[in-house]
A protein has these predicted regions:
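Conserved small/polar residues in nucleotide/adenosyl-binding loops
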Residues: 198-200
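Short glycine-centered, acidic/aromatic-flanked micro-motifs in structured strand/loop junctions
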Residues: 15, 46-48, 141-143, 169-172
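N-terminal capping/small domains of soluble enzymes
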Residues: 1-78
Length: 200
């Protein structure tokens, strides 16, 4: 896919299900996935395979049933998450593993209890492990809009070097307004040395 093309990444079946009262059965998720496929969505994030048997089964069924777009499973930067995502995606025509780790100072200190070097190491290991299973690996630095920009650039460069093919810049807590977010994306495009090889 052309690097300059716009890719539609739909996370209704994963992030959307976190909305109050939005629980879906496996069959309902498949119906939605088939509709998304018919609409021409490029990537369907089908679920978080390690989180529950239901999510694993949904990702597996969607991976087997959807043929005209990529199917992704979310995974933390943890070996068991990566392995479970890969297992759920085994029958996918075009599988993607989407791995993420907290990157803001507040999340690193209070949620992860890790320093920046440890976060980079965890992210690189996760991307490297995911690449053993699939060609297409997406990486997200969670809470990116509150992350120190120099650290964010280093983290992105390291994960791209490890094999990430798509970089997602999430505004996890709704911290950034549109203009600020746009400026951050411009800065990332201008500063990340190896960004030209991947999608953002």
């Amino acid at each position: 896919m052309d690097r300059d093309s716009v890719i539609i990444f739909d996370t209704t079946l994963r992030d959307g299900e976190q909305s109050a009262g939005a629980g879906l059965t496996v069959d309902e998720k498949l119906i939605i996935a088939k509709q998304l496929e018919s609409l021409g969505v490029d990537v369907i994030e089908a679920g978080f395979a390690v989180s529950s048997t239901g999510d694993f089964n949904a990702v597996s069924l969607i991976a087997e049933s959807v043929k005209n777009c990529k199917v992704a499973s979310l995974a933390r930067v943890v070996e068991k998450d990566i392995d479970k995502a890969a297992q759920a995606l085994e029958k996918a025509t075009d599988p993607r593993i989407h791995t993420f780790v907290s990157s803001s100072a507040i999340h690193m200190e209070h949620q992860m209890r890790k320093d920046p070097e440890e976060i980079i190491e965890m992210a690189v290991k996760a991307v490297t492990r995911a690449k053993k299973y699939v060609d297409d690996v997406e990486f997200s630095p969670m809470d990116a809009t509150r992350t120190d920009m120099d650290f964010l650039i280093t983290l992105l460069e390291e994960t791209i070097s490890a094999g990430a093919t798509t970089i997602n810049i999430p505004d996890t807590v709704g911290y950034s307004v549109s203009k600020e977010f746009g400026e951050s994306i411009k800065l990332i495009i201008n500063k990340v040395k190896n960004l030209s090889l991947i999608h953002i």
